[in-house]
Amino acid sequence: MLATLASATSEDAVAALEAACAAQTSWARTAPRVRAEILRRAFDLVTARSEDFALLMTLEMGKPLAEARGEVAYGAEFLRWFSEETVRDYGRYLTTPEGKNKILVQHKPVGPCLLITPWNFPLAMATRKVAPAVAAGCTMVLKPAKLTPLTSQLFAQTMMEAGLPAGVLNVVSSSSASGISGPLLKDSRLRKVSFTGSTPVGKRLMSDASRHVLRTSMELGGNAPFVVFEDADLDKAVEGAMAAKMRNMGEACTAANRFLVQESVAQEFTRKFAAAMGALSTGRGTDPASQVGPLINNGARDDIHALVTAAVDAGAVAVTGGAPVDGPGYFYQPTVLADVPNNAAILGQEIFGPVAPVTTFTTEQDAIKLANASEYGLAAYLYSRDFNRLLRVAEQIEFGMVGFNAGIISNAAAPFGGVKQSGLGREGGSEGIAEYTTTQYIGIADPYEN
């Protein structure tokens, strides 16, 4: 046991919202430069405490320390990025086409927000939501996942030390997610909900948010295709596949989930990919030699093994791995499956683990059809030496983010988000702050006639 926390009640959630509402007016009027400086100090503090955050995340959810350190750097970057974006949230002033009246457009904070974060990236998902909300002038209630509440507590403490006023960020940790979101979504004072998690839960939150027509940002499930064309550099494709599949042990919504490889190079790619996967070391996240940590719980391990077993029963071949690791802990062998039938269940849902199913295609149009054969549309990865082909395919596949010869594409400066059932809205980039503002238009009579 790492620690014990009080489980927040519905009353605690409402009290947190009341604190956010009380702070909203003064926070919205705080100068953008002041908000920017708070975010920049928070970046410096999180970076200085990198080892503390990394160890805490490893202890909470098992990821290797190297992965955790990478998350700290990635998560901190949202604080720095939005510290710089805070003063660039421009409106505009223009003359009407008729030339008489004037148009003034300004951006205002949307108001108190509910931010719900997942367990797989407990720091980065918090900073990716909190930073733009702070930049826009919004107050917040942050609900971290019940499996990883400690990281958010440390982050909130760090934000306070950076100078964030009381009431702007209110963390409510609870074993009952609905006990927090339920009463808040019924309260008309809440003006936005931002959620990262599963599509079914996101749909329920959107339904509840419709009661008061709340602004919503939904970063939901993914089923990313990793497409390798016959003209790709296979060594670089394998390197990218390892990054896209094994970041965070595969417990990421952007993780490559379906490896679509052109028939003429499928055997060579699969052989090299399996060799790289099989060479990974599995162990406790605190062991410096570990490259793959445990899954989040026993249920996750059992679900993954059921998908692998069903695929093998349907004709797939486990080239490497294919079973839980013997001994204590929720470990699963890094696995590559070849000859996976296109109708296999493992190709149709998020795996959220270290398993890579490989299937083949014949033509470019076949690859596009297979890539789009999913209700999800978050991330996709394309490997080819032909840039025109990459552009053609990217324009025809239904995904919010596409990597060209790159296995990791997330960046604070880029708009993160998907289409179809992968969600609504964008986090990061210049688009990120817009998710927390509302647009007000002011019509001004002709100043030369008044």
Curated annotation (Swiss-Prot):
Sequence positions that bind substrate: 128, 247, 253, 410
Induction: Is transcribed only in the presence of nicotine.
Pfam families: Aldedh (PF00171)
GO molecular function: succinate-semialdehyde dehydrogenase (NAD+) activity; succinate-semialdehyde dehydrogenase (NADP+) activity
PROSITE patterns: ALDEHYDE_DEHYDR_GLU (PS00687)
Any Gene Ontology biological process: nicotine catabolic process
Tree of life domain: Bacteria
Binding-site residues for NADP(+), renumbered to this chain: 119-120, 143-146, 197-198, 220, 350
Keywords: NAD, NADP, Oxidoreductase, Plasmid
Active site per UniProt: 219, 253
CDD domains assigned: ALDH_F5_SSADH_GabD (cd07103)
EC number: 1.2.1.16
Swiss-Prot/TrEMBL catalytic activity: succinate semialdehyde + NAD(+) + H2O = succinate + NADH + 2 H(+); succinate semialdehyde + NADP(+) + H2O = succinate + NADPH + 2 H(+)
Stored InterPro entries: Ald_DH/histidinol_DH, Ald_DH_C, Ald_DH_CS_GLU, Ald_DH_N, Aldehyde_DH_dom, Aldehyde_DH_Superfamily
EC main group: oxidoreductase
Site location (Transition state stabilizer): 120
Pathway(s) where this gene product acts: Alkaloid degradation; nicotine degradation
Protein family membership: Belongs to the aldehyde dehydrogenase family.
Function summary: Catalyzes the NAD(P)(+)-dependent oxidation of succinate semialdehyde to succinate, which may enter the citric acid cycle. Is involved in the catabolism of 4-methylaminobutanoate produced from nicotine. Acts preferentially with NADP(+) as cosubstrate but can also use NAD(+). To a lesser extent, is active also towards butyraldehyde (8.5% of the activity observed with succinate semialdehyde) and propionaldehyde (1.6% of the activity observed with succinate semialdehyde) as substrates.
Assembly: Homodimer.
Name of the protein in its database record: Succinate-semialdehyde dehydrogenase
